[in-house]
Amino acid sequence: MANSAQARKRARQAAKANSHNSALRSKYRTAVKAVRKAIEAGDAAQAAEIFKASAKTLDIIADKKIVHKNKAARHKSRLAAAVKGLQAPAAQ
């Protein structure tokens, strides 16, 4: 256990940050899952709309350094490709 006032304060701050960061990581995963679910449903318009909102969420969380920016970019790229793949067959 923390013995100094400074160590107690840092422990409190770490617990608070951990709670906040956990919530944001959960929001990140939920956003990715929502897009994947829309893609599996096969509705291109809905998937594109959900992807647009989710991409913004991924960027915000990456900017806060909750997840690495490259991880967020990788997820966005793969989800965008999947959404585009839904729209391509309909156009032909």
Curated annotation (Swiss-Prot):
One of its GO terms (molecular function) is small ribosomal subunit rRNA binding. Residues 1-25 are annotated as: Disordered. Keywords: Ribonucleoprotein, Ribosomal protein, RNA-binding, rRNA-binding. GO terms for biological process: translation. GO terms for cellular component: cytosol; small ribosomal subunit. Signal peptide: none annotated. SUPFAM superfamilies: Ribosomal protein S20. Belongs to the bacterial ribosomal protein bS20 family. Binds directly to 16S ribosomal RNA. This is Small ribosomal subunit protein bS20. The lineage of its organism: Bacteria, Pseudomonadati, Pseudomonadota, Betaproteobacteria, Burkholderiales.
